[in-house]
């Protein structure tokens, strides 16, 4: 009983120590208000983050494998088995990459050890996007290739101010076109001062000749949290009739970037190897082209630069090139096909490399391959033009 009384007395004493709101000084009241407000804001912030993560995770999906693509403005003629033909691959960088543009996900290191990182999450302005897309589509018009493979074509995207870039390329007179979607993101709030936003993009294939069919296939991608911000990587196989009764198989692709160590790109290359063999065994002429995001000339330091070789790049593994195929890239160019976007473009200072090109079957004769030097006026990539013939003997 004595113990119970003591406990009761202690509790009563503690209660007396607690002051009512009116008994607090103004300073003490302010401290309590600040603490309550801070706690409420912290709770609200945590709740907001949780809701946003649920939004990103629940909104995530991958497009199905083996999707038949729509063909716009199809042509009727087969491509001639005789003479020379051309194909251009061009990553147009969603119209954002003017020479002064840097991208927040790009990082690098200067030769003196100074780290570098890009700034922007969206294009500088809508006018800049329109200028760049008009410029890159103008290059296609100027060179008038028989076929074109275009990467990072945006539509209904925050990062490119909702400019429908498909129109600029599908509207080029004389071309049939297809689009394989490889980016469909939830709204990304990072970087906080210039959020990347909600975006849609794809790989376009253009043809002056009849398209028999075009199909989108899924590439493997990372399975960790990075999948929520990465592209839904894919490639498209487009079949074109040749007037000797055979078929040209054009494989349009865009492999993973920001893949430290190249683990995912290795898986993608292994899948591509299988696909190349299958298309060749069907009797097709085969040309795979696009942005491989891997060095295609076995020289990571070919071009003068004030920067070290970035950690994301590695050379394409020749073991992933099947029999009867070869990499075709411009080894003799004075400029790379891609610049680092961690710093503003300046020739001779910014890191450049050759990651855009082709893998070609041995029943196709390579006449020439050329990086078209645009001085990176409209994109962080230069277009690459392949001139070829069909072997008919």
Predicted regions and their residues:
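Active-site beta-strand/loop signature of hydrolases that rely on acidic residues for catalysis
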Residues: 86-92, 116-122, 132-162, 206, ...
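Beta-strand-turn-beta hairpins that frame and shape the catalytic cleft
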Residues: 77-87, 99, 198-215, 229-253, ...
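Alpha-helical scaffolding within the catalytic cores
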Residues: 71-74, 134-136, 223-224, 232-237
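N-terminal, active-site-proximal structural segment of metallo-dependent hydrolase catalytic domains
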Residues: 4-171, 179-190, 194-200
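Conserved S-adenosyl-L-methionine
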Residues: 177-185, 214-220, 368-372
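Metal-dependent phosphoester-hydrolase catalytic domains
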Residues: 20-41, 54-75, 277-287, 294-393
């Amino acid at each position: 009983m004595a113990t119970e009384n003591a406990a009761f007395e202690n509790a009563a004493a503690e209660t007396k120590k607690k002051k009512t709101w009116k008994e607090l000084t103004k300073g003490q009241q302010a401290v309590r208000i600040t603490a309550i407000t801070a706690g409420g804001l912290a709770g609200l912030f945590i709740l907001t983050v949780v809701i946003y993560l649920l939004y990103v995770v629940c909104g995530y999906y991958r497009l199905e494998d083996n999707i038949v693509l729509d063909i716009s403005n199809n042509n009727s003629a087969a491509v001639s088995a005789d003479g020379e033909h051309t194909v251009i691959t061009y990553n147009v960088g969603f119209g954002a990459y003017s020479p002064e543009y840097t991208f927040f996900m790009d990082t690098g290191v200067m030769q003196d050890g100074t780290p570098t990182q890009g700034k922007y999450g969206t294009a500088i302005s809508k006018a800049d996007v329109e200028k760049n897309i008009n410029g890159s589509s103008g290059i296609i018009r100027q060179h008038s290739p028989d076929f074109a493979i275009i990467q990072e074509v945006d539509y209904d995207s925050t990062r490119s101010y909702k400019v429908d870039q498909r129109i600029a390329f599908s509207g080029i007179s004389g071309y049939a076109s297809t689009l394989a979607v490889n980016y469909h993101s939830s709204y990304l709030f990072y970087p906080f001062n210039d959020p990347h936003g909600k975006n849609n993009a794809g790989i376009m294939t253009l043809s002056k000749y009849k398209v028999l069919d075009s199909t989108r296939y899924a590439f493997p991608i990372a399975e960790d949290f990075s999948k929520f911000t990465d592209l839904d990587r894919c490639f498209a196989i487009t079949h074109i009739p040749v007037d000797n009764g055979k078929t040209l198989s054009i494989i349009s692709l865009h492999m993973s970037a920001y893949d430290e160590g190249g683990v995912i790109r290795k898986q993608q290359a292994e899948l591509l190897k299988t696909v190349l063999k299958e298309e060749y065994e069907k009797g097709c002429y085969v040309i795979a082209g696009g942005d491989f995001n891997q060095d295609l000339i076995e020289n990571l330091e070919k071009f003068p630069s004030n920067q070290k070789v970035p950690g994301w790049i590695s050379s394409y593994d020749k073991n992933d090139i099947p029999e009867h195929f070869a990499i075709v890239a411009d080894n003799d160019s004075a400029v790379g096909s891609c610049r680092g976007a961690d710093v503003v473009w300046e020739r001779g200072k910014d890191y450049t490399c050759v990651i855009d090109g082709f893998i070609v079957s041995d029943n196709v004769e390579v006449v020439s391959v050329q990086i078209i030097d645009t001085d990176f006026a409209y994109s962080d990539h230069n277009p690459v033009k392949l001139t070829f013939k069909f072997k008919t003997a």
